[in-house]
A protein has these predicted regions:
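Domain-level signal for soluble alpha/beta catalytic cores
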Residues: 1-390
Length: 390
């Protein structure tokens, strides 16, 4: 993984605005199950080529495919893994799992919350033994990103995949005897995707909101201590089993508290989860650091010892608002984190994705996404000048 040797590098979190024709294709498949493979292939290849070029033009160093081919960052695996299918029981349980404590605390806001990223998602269920049966979609994603990167020539390339833990929230278990056996089964199938991404030469980003937002909704009935000991520790152990044998410096972990504009008053504090997260055998950690409930936590991180082999990727751009951050504010946020960790182990990022699920209208307008990423690049240049003096 490239580090910030003479300036702060820039990256983002994953999903980016999809072109309307591709949205229609992906959404049509989700609704009817029908897909014209040839049309989808052409549309995806073009979308990935364009999105990588746009990232490079915006000044992003570590780019990805924008998750162009995926209906969401989690549920896409039902097209690759057997044992997953639509089921009305899963849909019912899924709706309950998505009810967060903050939405319960503010019921008048809860109505708005029903329009969040996954409010319209018909959660599939795990209805049989899991097996990674079809690598063709994964191989196409890899090929498209390689081709696009060869043209744009970014500093580095990453590709996302969900953690075993977060999949328990979006693929409802209707088959395995316990959540523990289910997480283990998910880890076993996901290791195929993790390894393929690393072997393709990409940095693997593992999306793990199960360490943050799941406390607020899926496990709202537990105490913080119970969540840490029973859920977070288990999920990190499952993840480590899935990435066993992969080089730590080719992986990064994304932790977030739910990519929605809402109160977030019941978010688990970063200090209550980061120690467990650091047990993940990855090098870099992407965290929310721009939204108003977590912007202050750089001060908390100053109170702990960050392992010498770890890199931080704080979000210095908020992914849930149409405000375009001023580059000087971006620089200020980066400089705060330069007080937390050595400048060489700091990469500037975004809190979360901009196109989390195709079924929901994005919160941030497409044109504003690119203005935000340009502000990220400009602000990072300002901070780099301060940190390196040139």
């Amino acid at each position: 993984m490239k580090t910030s040797t003479d300036r702060i590098l820039t990256t983002h979190t994953g999903s980016l605005p999809r072109p309307k024709p591709l949205i229609d294709i992906v959404l049509g498949r989700e609704k009817s199950g029908a897909l014209d493979a040839g049309v989808f292939e052409v549309a995806t290849a073009k979308a990935v080529e364009d999105i990588v070029a746009q990232q490079a033009a915006a000044g992003i160093d570590v780019v990805n495919d924008g998750e162009m081919s995926k209906p969401s960052y989690t549920t896409y695996i039902r097209h690759r893994v057997s044992g997953i299918a639509p089921d009305p029981r899963a849909a019912e349980q899924g709706r309950d799992i998505m009810v967060g404590r903050d939405l319960l605390a503010f019921p008048d806001f809860g109505v708005r919350g029903q329009r969040s990223n996954f409010a319209a998602t018909p959660f599939p269920g795990c209805v049989g033994e899991l097996a990674y049966q079809d690598r063709s979609a994964l191989d196409r994603d890899i090929a498209h990103l390689k081709a696009a990167a060869a043209k744009a020539k970014p500093a580095e390339v990453f590709m996302t995949a969900p953690s075993p833990g977060i999949l328990t929230r979006f693929i409802i278990n209707l088959h395995y005897p316990s959540e523990e056996t289910y997480v283990a089964a998910l880890a076993e199938v996901m290791k195929i995707e993790y390894r393929a991404i690393v072997e393709a030469g990409f940095v693997l980003q593992i999306d793990a909101p199960d360490l943050g937002s799941a406390r607020n909704n899926q496990y709202r009935h537990l105490s913080d201590d119970e969540f840490r000991s029973k859920i977070a520790e288990r999920n990190i152990a499952a993840l480590n089993a899935a990435i066993e044998g992969l080089p730590a410096d080719r992986m990064r972990l994304h932790i977030c508290w739910g990519n929605y504009e809402g109160p977030h008053t019941h978010d688990l504090p970063l200090l209550k989860i980061i120690d467990i997260a650091f047990k993940a055998r990855v090098q870099a950690f992407s965290i929310e650091a721009a939204n108003p409930r977590h912007d202050h936590e750089w001060e908390d991180l100053k109170t702990i010892k960050i392992p010498d082999d770890k890199i931080l990727i704080p979000g210095v751009i908020d992914s849930t608002t149409n405000f375009v951050e001023h580059p000087r504010l971006v620089a200020q946020r980066i400089l705060r984190y330069a007080e937390v960790i050595d400048r060489e182990r700091l990469i500037a990022g975004v809190d979360c994705g901009f196109g989390t699920a195709v079924r929901t209208e994005p919160t941030v307008a497409d044109s504003i996404v690119w203005a935000k990423l340009a502000a990220l690049s400009e602000g990072t240049a300002i901070a780099s000048k301060t940190l390196w003096g040139s």
